[in-house]
């Protein structure tokens, strides 16, 4: 086939895919549910390769996954996509002074505390966590938009550092496959491909295709020892989708990191749910819990997948978390609330859930705090 025909086919395919992506965008890039996929069957014995096993509740017979038992179930509400998108795009974002620290201060502050256990907010859900001599990165999102190609909600604040400036990382934690968490370009250009990756079931191929060397899929309640760290993958009330027909075909979840006597929980995007009382009973008390506090309006659709600030604090209380770090705000416009409303409501609601204001922890983008400082 000639080069001309190759090029023509490429643009034809790209055009077809772009049309699909436009439809996909509202469903997956903004993390908004589309239809009700909640099953009602109980855990049961099924047969596979002539061997029987007990299928966990969150595993469905068709190979997809569902939320923990007792979670809020989506109805078949027909969401006004175009009205939502128009309203979201009409929001004018004014970034408050001091929301991000100067970029030339980010790496020096990290270096100055290199012998301490620290947490640094890169933006949105991307953090660097240094604990037990290991550097962990969570849901690396560095692209200018959350979506395929150049589509999807765009950042209004840049990452605290460039991807190329990222310090050597030992462990990458991925919670789920939405575009504001699983960033194709960041994955492709990640500078440390020897980093150990922990990801939910059915997502390892994504990393292997980009030549990561050590990729490990995890199911809920599975544990992984990473030298002196113990990491446990735990449930969350969310969903997954990246393409038109792949709803809930990959798992989602949170990571509990244990080192010596400290416990840090990095939550997947989540709605409130009874599961957090159970997790608190089994795994609590937890020293620090990272919980999403943004992207909760309009409530009639966001309530199925994103907690609001008060619900985030309720989740923290149910987990028996001593400190709650508010994340998933102040970086990208994904919903209809004022993008700087979440932290105000987060602090204002702290006492309603048994926390002092200092227990509801907020970062500036690029800021580094020591874990000792957070827990004091």
What is each residue range found by the language model?
Residues 6-19:
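Bacterial N-terminal signal peptides that target proteins for export
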Residues 29-153, 157-163, 199-266, 287-294, 345-367, 371-375, ...:
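Metallo-beta-lactamase
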Residues 126-132, 225-286, 303, 307-311:
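Catalytic core of the metallo-beta-lactamase
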Residues 129, 139, 176, 183, ...:
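Divalent metal-coordination and catalytic microenvironments
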Residues 140-142, 177, 236-237, 268-270, ...:
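Active-site metal-binding loops of divalent metal-dependent hydrolases
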Residues 151-198, 214, 284-290, 294:
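Active-site metal-binding motif and surrounding structural segment of the metallo-beta-lactamase
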């Amino acid at each position: 086939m000639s080069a001309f025909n190759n090029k023509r086919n490429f643009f034809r395919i790209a055009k077809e895919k772009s049309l699909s992506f436009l439809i996909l965008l509202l469903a997956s890039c903004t993390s908004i549910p589309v239809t009700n996929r909640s099953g009602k069957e109980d855990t049961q014995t099924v047969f596979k390769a002539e061997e029987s096993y007990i299928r966990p509740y969150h595993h469905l017979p068709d190979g997809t996954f569902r939320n923990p038992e007792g979670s809020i179930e989506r109805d078949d509400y027909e969401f006004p996509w175009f009205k939502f998108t128009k309203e979201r795009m009409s929001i004018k974002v004014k970034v408050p002074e001091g929301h991000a620290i100067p970029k030339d201060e980010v790496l020096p502050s990290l270096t100055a505390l290199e012998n301490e256990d620290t947490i640094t907010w890169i933006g949105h859900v991307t953090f660097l966590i240094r604990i037990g001599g290991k550097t962990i990165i969570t849901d690396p999102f560095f692209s200018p938009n959350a979506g395929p190609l150049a589509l999807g909600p765009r950042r209004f604040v840049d990452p605290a550092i460039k991807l190329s400036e990222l310090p050597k990382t030992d462990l990458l934690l991925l919670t789920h496959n939405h575009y504001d968490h699983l960033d194709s370009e960041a994955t492709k250009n990640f500078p440390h491909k020897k980093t150990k990756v922990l990801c939910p079931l059915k997502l390892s191929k994504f990393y292997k295709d980009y030549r990561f060397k050590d990729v490990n899929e995890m199911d809920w309640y599975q544990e992984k020892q990473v030298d002196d760290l113990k990491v446990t993958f735990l449930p969350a009330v969310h969903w997954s989708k990246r393409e038109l027909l792949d709803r809930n075909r990959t798992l989602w979840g949170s990571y509990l990191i244990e080192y010596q006597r400290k416990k840090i929980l990095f939550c997947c995007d989540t709605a409130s749910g009874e599961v957090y009382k159970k997790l608190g009973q089994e795994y609590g008390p937890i020293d620090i819990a990272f919980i999403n506090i943004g992207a909760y309006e309009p409530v009639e659709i966001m309530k199925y997948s994103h907690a609001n600030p008060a619900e985030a604090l309720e989740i923290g209380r149910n987990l028996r978390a001593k400190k709650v770090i508010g994340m998933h705000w102040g970086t990208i416009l994904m919903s209809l609330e004022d993008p700087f409303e979440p932290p105000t409501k987060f602090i204002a609601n702290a006492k309603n859930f048994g926390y002092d204001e200092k227990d509801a922890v907020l970062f500036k983008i690029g800021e580094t705090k020591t874990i000792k400082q957070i827990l004091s």
